[in-house]
């Protein structure tokens, strides 16, 4: 199963920063087992949402020629739980690159202004056409940004 963890892109500064939203619904299948009597969004899914948002930043900044693939999580801290019904505000910024072929991002997720995760991760850009249908990604981006 493929998880799409960004429900809306709210703002974009090409090559620099992106903000988005994840709405956590009770119907999310990962909540069935995490945990049945007290469902919370797994922290790794919050990290994945930040990583997916990084991909959208690189796609939009490269006219949908590139996509970010994470290779390493450098730092990650969690600060409380995310529950069904929460709206998670996601922010990702480009950090200083240690080399030409590596990118570093820092990201955070908040619910009602309270930080839930802070992370720094690195990876590489790949040609989008090698992993996704470019036109489909452009159409999906229009839906996420409500620009279509």
Can you annotate each of these PLM segments?
Residues 3-5, 88, 103:
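Hydrophobic core residues within well-ordered beta-strands of beta-rich domains
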Residues 7-10, 74, 79, 93-95:
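Conserved positions in beta-strands of structured domains
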Residues 53-89, 119-126:
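Hydrophobic beta-strand-centered segment that forms part of the acyl-chain substrate-binding groove
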Residues 22, 91-94:
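Short, hydrophobic/aromatic-enriched beta-strand segments in well-ordered soluble domains
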Residues 1-41:
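Catalytic strand-loop segment that frames the active site of acyl-thioester-processing enzymes
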Residues 34-42, 46-56, 70:
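Compact, glycine-rich, soluble single-domain proteins
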Residues 84-86, 93-148:
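HotDog/MaoC-like acyl-thioester-processing domains
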């Amino acid at each position: 199963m493929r998880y799409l963890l960004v429900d809306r892109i709210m703002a974009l500064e090409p090559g620099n920063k992106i903000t988005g939203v994840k709405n956590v619904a009770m119907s999310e299948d990962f909540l069935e087992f995490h945990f049945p009597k007290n469902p919370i969004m797994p922290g790794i899914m919050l990290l994945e949402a930040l990583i997916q948002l990084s991909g959208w930043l690189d796609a939009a900044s490269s006219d949908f020629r590139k996509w970010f693939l994470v290779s390493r999580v450098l730092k990650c801290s969690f600060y409380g739980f995310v529950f069904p019904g929460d709206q998670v505000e996601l922010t990702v910024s480009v950090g200083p690159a240690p080399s030409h072929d590596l990118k570093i991002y820092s990201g955070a997720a908040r619910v009602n202004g309270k930080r839930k995760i802070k992370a720094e991760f690195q990876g590489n850009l790949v040609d989008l056409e090698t992993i996704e249908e470019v036109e489909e990604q452009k159409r999906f981006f229009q839906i996420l940004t409500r620009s279509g």
